[in-house]
Amino acid sequence: MAYPLQMGLQDATSPIMEELLHFHDHTLMIVFLISSLVLYIISLMLTTKLTHTSTMDAQEVETVWTILPAIILILIALPSLRILYMMDEINNPSLTVKTMGHQWYWSYEYTDYEDLNFDSYMIPTQELKPGELRLLEVDNRVVLPMEMTIRMLISSEDVLHSWAVPSLGLKTDAIPGRLNQTTLMTMRPGLYYGQCSEICGSNHSFMPIVLELVPLSHFEKWSTSML
């Protein structure tokens, strides 16, 4: 999860988020090199007194600054497309959970179970226990098994919402009348916090998401107790 004054991205806790972090570093390095080159050329232009008033064309230079940007764009596009295909790929999910956005709470339904569903509301600040996080805690956490592929079906009952958990690299729009899907998987247990990431009204900032990833045996006990 994020912490105060954090300058970087949250720690990756899923394979997709690890790929996104690598892509971020890869792209940032390209931007840094381009910026350094541009600043160097500008500094030369400001400090040198040499001029080329007789130069009418420079075919070699034009060729270079056409081919080089094309190569740079390819170096950025290829890993980006790879990650996009990885995010869209859903192969034999072990569990499917349907989440619906409301003003201003989330509801969840475990579609593999006959009657396992609940609403998840933010806990008001005055009701928080010591150590709990303001604007991030909910009354019902989404308990999921770790090390398993989970399909999330996401939609909305009223207005546009967005179901987002940054540390897992997830952000999927919840659109009324449309069912979007995404997958999540994490290799270690823990609590993962997120929030609605689409302005949806006056209480938009009061729609937290809390995922509790646990070993499969713990998940089975929890699901049995909820039925």
Curated annotation (Swiss-Prot):
Q: Name one GO biological process term.
A: ATP synthesis coupled electron transport
Q: What is its main location?
A: mitochondrion
Q: What are the transmembrane regions?
A: 15-45, 60-87
Give the Mitochondrial intermembrane membrane side ranges: 1-14, 88-227
Question: Which cofactors does this gene product need?
Answer: Cu cation
Q: Which residues lie on this side of the membrane: Mitochondrial matrix?
A: 46-59
- Localisation: Mitochondrion inner membrane
Reactions accelerated catalytically: 4 Fe(II)-[cytochrome c] + O2 + 8 H(+)(in) = 4 Fe(III)-[cytochrome c] + 2 H2O + 4 H(+)(out)
Membrane topology classification: Multi-pass membrane protein
| Pfam families to which the protein is assigned, alphabetical | COX2, COX2_TM
Please give the SUPFAM superfamilies that the UniProt record associates with this protein. Cupredoxins, Cytochrome c oxidase subunit II-like, transmembrane region
Recorded superkingdom: Eukaryota
Provide the binding site for Mg(2+).
198
Keywords in UniProt for this one? Answer: Copper, Electron transport, Magnesium, Membrane, Metal-binding, Mitochondrion, Mitochondrion inner membrane, Respiratory chain, Translocase, Transmembrane, Transmembrane helix, Transport
**Assembly:** Component of the cytochrome c oxidase (complex IV, CIV), a multisubunit enzyme composed of 14 subunits. The complex is composed of a catalytic core of 3 subunits MT-CO1, MT-CO2 and MT-CO3, encoded in the mitochondrial DNA, and 11 supernumerary subunits COX4I, COX5A, COX5B, COX6A, COX6B, COX6C, COX7A, COX7B, COX7C, COX8 and NDUFA4, which are encoded in the nuclear genome.
Its biological purpose is as follows: Component of the cytochrome c oxidase, the last enzyme in the mitochondrial electron transport chain which drives oxidative phosphorylation. The respiratory chain contains 3 multisubunit complexes succinate dehydrogenase (complex II, CII), ubiquinol-cytochrome c oxidoreductase (cytochrome b-c1 complex, complex III, CIII) and cytochrome c oxidase (complex IV, CIV), that cooperate to transfer electrons derived from NADH and succinate to molecular oxygen, creating an electrochemical gradient over the inner membrane that drives transmembrane transport and the ATP synthase.
Q: What is this protein called?
A: Cytochrome c oxidase subunit 2
The species is Phoca vitulina
Q: What is the lineage of its organism?
A: Eukaryota, Metazoa, Chordata, Craniata, Vertebrata
**Underlying gene:** MT-CO2
